Amino acid sequence: MLFVRTKTFGIIAAVMLTVGASQAFAASLEEIKARGTMTVATEDSYKPFEYVENGKPMGLDHELLALLRKEASFKIDQQIIPWTGLLAGVATGKYDVALTAAVITPERVQSLAFTMPIADATQYYVVRADESRIKGVADLAGKSVGVQSGGASYAALADLEPTLAKTGGKLGKVVQYTSLPEAYQDLANGRLDYVINGVVNLVSLTKDQPKRFRMGEAVGAPTYAAWAVAKGNDGLLAYLDTFMAKVRASGELYALQEKWLGRAFKDMPATATK
């Protein structure tokens, strides 16, 4: 894990690759069909969207992948990898699709194109169940926070910082993690004051461990999660959007949301690109 005390978050886009690089190396839908294989990358520890349990891939995205395989005329090769490098791998063409619930951010759309959203991904904070100092967003001022390196929780700090400033507060120590389960462990052990993550993930966490964690309020603007391809790969994006529209219309997506996320997000927009 990486420890940093952060003062400003205006230039997060620097970690992403250029649009030109994305367009230069990404395989088109025609090329994928010609070679007979599409390579997708999914995360290894992103419950309830993607995770591995007893050696078996689990989660909402894995069930959506099973539906996509039934529709596809080509083989789909799934690579289960850590979060770090996943989106960059798609931007450079190493993988064709980030088949992960990637939160759509202004920085990411510089090098990636996103499908129809698959879930709400508004960022919230979570604290220990017995935490008495933090009752609202304003109380986060000066407190240590855990976020995922390069993830949407890190990007949410750009919204939280000015919110705290309105009441004279500032961000405290920011600790970045490769995966958020590490952050939850540090939170439980008192090494952090709060952790930021998407609403779905935190609902799952607090439902599974109500005696350890308590969910707080939203720390950023409404956001959504979707699959991603390299920016400019319009044919592949259209193919995936057609699939997404079909599973929405059939109700299969909403049934999977109920199963894995605890609720159906039927009011999601057709597009949520910022």
Q: Which sequence ranges carry the predicted segments?
A:
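Periplasmic-binding protein-like
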Residues: 44, 120-127, 203-245, 261-274
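Beta->alpha turn/N-cap motifs
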Residues: 42-46, 79-84, 93-105, 121, ...
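Alpha-to-beta junction loops
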Residues: 38-39, 73-75, 91-100, 143-144, ...
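A ligand-binding cleft/hinge motif common to bilobed small-molecule-binding domains
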Residues: 85, 102-110, 156-163, 185-188, ...
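Extracytoplasmic small-molecule ligand-binding "clamshell" domains
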Residues: 27-101, 240, 250
